[in-house]
């Protein structure tokens, strides 16, 4: 009787441990969301975030928006919310222009960060303060093409970090349409 009780206790403890550890971690792969077609790039948009096409400021594009730029706001309902919510702003160089990594000296308190590796890219970058807001700037190259990501880490009452599963899922989900 005692050994049966001990065996049941061990099995129950093992099952509890499996469920506890299965729920741990900040895996980008476990984030739910959908793909947004930005034109020349596709991006992953987690639930609770909303994506917007880049503005065609000079009327250069047939689409009526910049197909190389996407902004994704956490908790955003409209494009105006991008001014008071944490956001990720993605810019792709396109095939006929070149982007370069913005200098951290342009910002206050610029500090290099460790590279962030996703399945398709290795992102290098830094954190800094821009107009009083904590930001991160990331950059990667894919042959002759580049992608720059600017992350507003705090805005309004909300904060995000580069370690958040949502942010990692966004970085993982940036795909250049070939």
Give residue spans per PLM region:
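Bacterial N-terminal signal peptides that target proteins for export
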Residues: 1-11
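C-terminal motif of bacterial Sec signal peptides marking the signal peptidase cleavage site
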Residues: 19-23
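N-terminal "mature-domain start" segment
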Residues: 28-66
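A structural detector for beta-sheet-dominated domains
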Residues: 37, 44-46, 52-54, 73, ...
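Conserved polar/disulfide-associated segments of primarily extracytoplasmic proteins
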Residues: 55-148
């Amino acid at each position: 009787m005692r050994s049966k009780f001990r065996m049941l206790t061990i099995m129950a403890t093992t099952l509890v441990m499996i469920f506890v550890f299965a729920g741990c971690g900040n895996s980008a792969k476990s984030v739910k969301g959908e793909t947004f077609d930005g034109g020349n790039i596709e991006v992953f948009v987690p639930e609770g975030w909303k994506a917007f096409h880049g503005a065609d400021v000079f009327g250069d594009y047939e689409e009526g928006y910049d197909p190389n730029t996407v902004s994704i706001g956490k908790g955003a309902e409209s494009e105006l919310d991008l001014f008071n919510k944490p956001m990720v702003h993605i810019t792709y160089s396109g095939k006929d222009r070149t982007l370069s990594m913005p200098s951290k000296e342009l910002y206050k308190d610029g500090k290099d960060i460790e590279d962030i590796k996703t399945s398709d890219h290795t992102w290098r970058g830094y954190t800094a303060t821009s107009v009083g807001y904590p930001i991160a700037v990331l950059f990667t190259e894919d042959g002759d093409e580049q992608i720059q990501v600017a992350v507003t880490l705090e805005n309004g009452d909300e904060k995000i970090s580069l370690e958040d599963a949502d942010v990692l899922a966004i970085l993982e989900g940036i795909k250049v349409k070939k």
